[in-house]
Amino acid sequence: MMNEKVSSNDLQELFTKPYGVAAPSKDKWAKFYDQNVIFIDPTQEKSGLNAYIDAQDKLVKRCDDVFLETHAIAITGSIGFVEWTMGLKIMGKEFIYPGTTRLVFGDNGKIKNHRDYFDFCGPTFGPVPILGSITRWIYSRFIL
């Protein structure tokens, strides 16, 4: 059990993955994430460390490669934020997602809540013929 919460250096390490480098191991995730972690992003919601690790493994497996670059980290009390850029290579095409993660640290110092905020639709469907035009039209009508 950890006595101190996850540090900025720990988050820098967790949220940095160059192309061609392996993702963190299950033991690495378990060192920093609570067994009952809640994970939410624009595409899914998972409860528990094993479900979180499974979600990360599935992302890596369905991509040719993944990168994650950290830009800024802030921790105040039991809350942390990480600004990042994620790149996914799928069938030779690269998709870039800028985003932010909000983390809540539990009494044991581990991450008990992890929520990712990023635009899934624009970078995913924008480059696709026909879907890209529809996505941009929807954005122009309802978002921009």
Q: What does each model-found stretch correspond to?
A:
Residues 2, 39, 114-117:
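Intrinsically disordered, low-complexity regulatory regions of eukaryotic regulatory proteins
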Residues 2-35:
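Short acidic-aromatic low-complexity motifs
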Residues 4-7, 48, 135:
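Residue-level preference for long, well-ordered alpha-helices that form the structural scaffold
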Residues 7-18, 56, 68, 99-101:
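A generic structural signal for ordered secondary structure
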Residues 10, 28, 51, 130-134:
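Exposed alpha-helical structural elements
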Residues 19-22, 41, 92:
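Flexible interhelical turns and helix-capping residues at alpha-helix boundaries
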Residues 26-78:
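A solvent-exposed, acidic/Ser-Thr-rich amphipathic alpha-helical stretch
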Residues 61-67, 74-144:
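A beta-strand edge to alpha-helix "cap/lid" segment located at domain peripheries
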